[in-house]
Amino acid sequence: MKLNLFLSFLGLFIAFSSSAQQLKWNDPLKNKAIQGRIATEELANYYRLPDQLKSQVRSPVWSLGTNSAGLYVDFKTDASAITIRYKVSGSLNMPHMPTTGVSGVDLYAKDDKGNWNWAFGNYNFTDTVTYTYQKLGENAHFTYRLYLPLYNTVEWLEIGVENDKNFKFEMEEGKPIVIYGTSIAQGACATRPGLAWSNMLGRAVPSPIINVAFSGNGRLEQPIINHINQVDAAVYILDCIPNLALTKDRTAHQLDSLLTNAVDEIRKRHPKTPIIITEHSSGFNKAIFNLDKNEEYRKSSAVAYAFVGRVAASGDKNLYLLTNKEIGLDINSTVDYAHPNDIGMLKIADAYQKLIAKILKK
């Protein structure tokens, strides 16, 4: 009896091992298939910034630049089951943001009619993180999109399908929308990567998205302006006001100077490219009881409002303002004083999509 039981377990183990060995693993990094960043072919890791910027930016900017926020991988396969395995180097979660958002991946698929679908995966967060997707159907004509973790650094990642199934990495074409922003644009506090507003926007517009956002450190700094300025973009988004509060160390005049420098630098190389400057998405809501923060956000947003009005009046017809009112966050939209939840992320993405649609129609 014991021998029969042992042989049964042994048979199951061998069958499971054989099945696991039948997967073929595809490495997007080796295939230069990482999207969502600048000069991806030059990067041999999952960072968003190239090595030469390490000596030019402040330490926290470099550290956050190693996070894979906004990075994504497109591929086609006729496999009905997909397994993702990878390793991250940082903490799995934060007090105000779950593991699935900080360290998880997220899988979508665009069908042959251009409609997006979402795939639910079973996940296991151990030393090697795994997401397994089963019974997807054989969607050979679909383009899958895998979003990488928002607030963690990926050391390695592989996509596994059965050995007899086709698999091919894809790359988006067209001029990208480049986003320079703060923690909100980096993805705090979406519950999963596909719900970060930049990733939602990427599914709603016909352009690739490049995410250059740094939690607490979106400050319109010269090295990052130089970095994004090398891209021939469809639109530049400067969403840094949440990290540029007016304090004793930063006056309204100094904030205006930062905005002026950023726009002037971009205009030297891209005189006609649309630039969007965004007010603080939070604040301005009397139903949220935080008078100090509301006033802080109002003051810095007022500087942005005045700047865009002045520059547009002087002749720059391709400079735009996205207002707090157009974004429309409310008492159901945030996890704290500023960071949007999934509802807030959708509101931000929708506001950008509407404005960008108008801009690109011109």
What positions do the PLM features span?
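Short helix-loop-beta junction
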Residues: 198-211, 309
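Oxyanion-hole/transition-state-stabilizing segment in secreted/luminal serine hydrolases
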Residues: 193, 201, 219-260, 265, ...
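N-terminal secretory targeting modules
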Residues: 2-8, 15-176, 357-361
